Amino acid sequence: MVKLFCSIVGVAGSPFSVEVNEGKTVDDLKKAIKAENLDDPTLRNVAPKNLQLFLAKKGDAWLRYNEDLDTYLQSEIDTSSYLHMRASWKLSKPTLFGPDVSLGEDVVHVLVVVPGQRLPIAATAIHEPHPARKKRWEELNKILDRNQRAKVNAAGESSTGYSYVSFSDVDRVMRARRYEQPRKVIENEKIDVLYEYLLLLTKAFGEIVNGKEAKRLYFIVPVLVCVCGLFDGEVRILAEETVTGKRVHGDGAFEFVIERGSKRVCIVKAKRDDFQQGLAQAYVGSEVLADLEGLTDLFSIVTNFKEWYFSRCLNDRVERDDATMDMEHDIPTREAVKKIAEKIYSMLS
């Protein structure tokens, strides 16, 4: 069991503790918070799923539980400076309350935002998108609602799967401008290790481009892992991640989501080399993630290993770059591997 101290944003004198098994999820923590506060009018009529939780930590420092806490809770707290805790995350996640994380003393671990609570403007800013992005969501929702093949969850909320939305529809709302994704230099020794492993995979699996589509993922993953390993444990790769929007009436599915702090890189494998559908999937999913986590800048990659499309979904625009993994006799060149890896490294830096 782990004991966590929580505070409600906007409410003075609100710190309280909850005990929950570290093997549980953030969703379970929401239920424990509600159960601990059945007599509290602030939480009495709120469904646990509607609570928004933020890790009360900046760098290695927890929020101090001292005489200044009440004043801080009622000030204009910018929750975007804290990590938004997604419901599906395990509490044992290294970036949350994993075994190597010190919980400290006289600190607050979780900030709770209650829907409908009168909060200072900055505390609610994460929930109100930029005007340009809000307009994009409204236009996107018209398409999603029109093409709706509803998936209904236990709360009776429905969303539209990305597979029911065409690229041409999404492109009308999220037309991408050209940009050049920068590169950040990776040491030759690291590239050599990655390249040697890819050569080993080529010997084991045979043809990449003309071979079976399913095996391409085995070539994509080492590139991602190599780059993520450069950050000394600061980066996590979430596999087969699915998200469902609240204000965006769609859902997204990614082969991987790479996380580093507030940065997100969403990875989509282009199925049957259909890059347009892959881009539609990535763009809808990115907006859903922006909706859920209050993010303003998201990266996505759509690839079949040979072709790579890099995109940025910003508040006021969408940008896209593309690059080719050059091949010689169906074997990637070292320079091409270096180019792709360094673009991804720059995204996460």
From Swiss-Prot:
Name the residue ranges of motif: HVLVXXP motif. Answer: 109-115
Its GO CC terms are: extracellular region; host cell nucleus
**Known InterPro entries for this protein?**
Crinkler_N
* Subcellular location per the Swiss-Prot or TrEMBL entry: Secreted; Host nucleus
Q: Which family does it belong to?
A: Belongs to the Crinkler effector family.
| Chain's role | Secreted effector that elicits necrosis in host plants, a characteristic of plant innate immunity.
> Can you name this protein?
Crinkler effector protein 5
Give the source species: Phytophthora infestans (Potato late blight agent)
* Gene that encodes the chain: CRN5
